[in-house]
A protein has these predicted regions:
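Glycine-rich phosphate/nucleotide-binding loop
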Residues: 117-130, 134-144, 224-228, 232-342
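Short beta-strand segments
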Residues: 11, 40-42, 64, 105-107, ...
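Glycine-rich phosphate/diphosphate-binding loop of Rossmann-like nucleotide-binding domains
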Residues: 20-21, 33, 37-39, 44-48, ...
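Phosphate/nucleotide-donor binding subsite
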Residues: 56-100
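N-terminal charge/polar-biased segments
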Residues: 1-10, 16-20, 49, 54, ...
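Short glycine/serine/threonine-rich phosphate/pyrophosphate-binding segments
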Residues: 18-22, 85-98, 102-116, 123, ...
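N-terminal glycine-rich anion-binding loop in soluble enzyme alpha/beta folds
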Residues: 21-72
Length: 343
């Protein structure tokens, strides 16, 4: 008897390269791993047309028709409420009612965040589900959370981010006893804004995490911590700056290398080494960012995602289910209730 599949609903219509790259990524995922089954949700005729180009085990891939598409420019709350037959809403209901374990989308971030809270729903006790992208560092990767749309956070939320992020890094990424740092503007404990000052002692006194103190933004690329905690406004700034600097550097390097004939010869020698270096700063190998703390896994992958990111976002869902991430998060959160009762 086959063990049951990890069932993943995929928004086939979301993102700049939908449906072509989404469908391709889904096929690559099922061909790469027998444990996963994908439900491609979206306009069936269009999806079927794309699927003709590929061979795959039909047992592992189904198409679910959804007539509507939520566009990136639409106000998320309204779109989720009104477009009941959209790929995002339909796929999220599949997670809510247990047909699927996870949902992957490259579509509207706002709609995914709102739908995650409203349709899939939070684990009891979780104050706010953080969007947690993996960012490349010299040592591997770090988890940066929150990078969602929730701009005002409370100290208790940041503590939950630290716990959920630690569970994820340990169980999905295999990092033993992950180091947790809080984003700050100096290493000293008395630095920072009100939120950081209030959160610092709470993290320091939290036995479930390995808190190493403040982390300055410039130490993030060096891999100063495995789990990096901040409010979403700060997280978004760090993430976008990261992406911008990476692509600017890449551009400079390409321009510089091709500028003279003599350097072209040198460029040929440098290129393989450089490619390897830049590849280590490429996040596509991990796929999207999980939205943690929901009753099911929601993965938001970049709007510009190609097949490889989609594939890896889908495969990420396997470890999430097999390592029972949500059970571990529930355990961490219910420890809070017990602690509150004892005080």
């Amino acid at each position: 008897e086959m063990a049951e599949y990890v069932n993943v609903a995929v928004d086939a219509m979301g993102g700049d390269n939908a449906p072509a790259e989404i469908v391709k990524g889904a096929v690559e995922a099922v061909n790469a791993d027998k444990r996963v089954k994908v439900f491609l949700v979206g306009k069936e005729p269009v999806i079927r047309e794309e699927l003709k180009a590929y061979s795959y085990d039909a047992e592992q891939l189904e198409v679910v028709h959804a007539e509507e598409v939520i566009e990136t420019a639409e106000p998320p709350v309204m779109a989720i409420r009104r477009k009941k037959d959209s790929s995002i809403v339909k796929a999220m209901y599949m997670v809510k009612n247990g047909e699927c374990d996870a949902f992957v989308s490259a579509g509207s971030t706002g709609a995914v965040l709102v739908g995650g809270q409203v349709i899939v729903g939070r684990i009891r006790g979780v104050e706010r589900p953080p969007l947690a992208p993996l960012i490349p560092t010299e040592k591997g990767v770090s988890l940066l959370l929150d990078c969602g749309a929730n701009v005002d956070a409370r100290p208790s939320m940041l503590v939950q981010f630290a716990k959920m992020g630690s569970v994820y890094m340990e169980s999905v990424m295999g990092v033993k006893n992950p180091r947790v740092g809080i984003v700050n503007i100096g290493a000293e404990e008395e630095k920072g804004n009100a939120l950081v000052k209030e959160t610092f002692p709470l993290l320091k006194n939290c036995p479930e995490i390995n808190f190493i103190g403040s982390v300055e933004a410039r130490d993030i690329p060096a891999g100063a911590a495995d789990v990096i905690v901040c409010e979403a406004f700060v997280g978004n700034v760090i993430l976008k700056m990261y992406e911008g600097v990476s692509s600017a550097l890449l551009h400079q390097v390409k321009q510089g290398m091709m500028s003279t004939l003599r350097s072209k010869m040198g460029a040929l020698l440098v290129k393989p080494a450089l490619k390897t270096t830049l590849k280590s700063f490429d996040t596509s190998q991990y796929g999207g960012a999980p939205l943690l703390g929901l009753n099911g896994l929601v993965v938001k992958t970049h709007g510009s995602s190609k097949a490889v990111e989609v594939k890896n976002s889908i495969l990420q869902c396997i470890a999430f289910k097999e390592e029972k991430i949500n059970e571990k998060i529930k355990e961490q959160i219910s420890l809070e209730d017990k602690a509150a009762e004892n005080n």
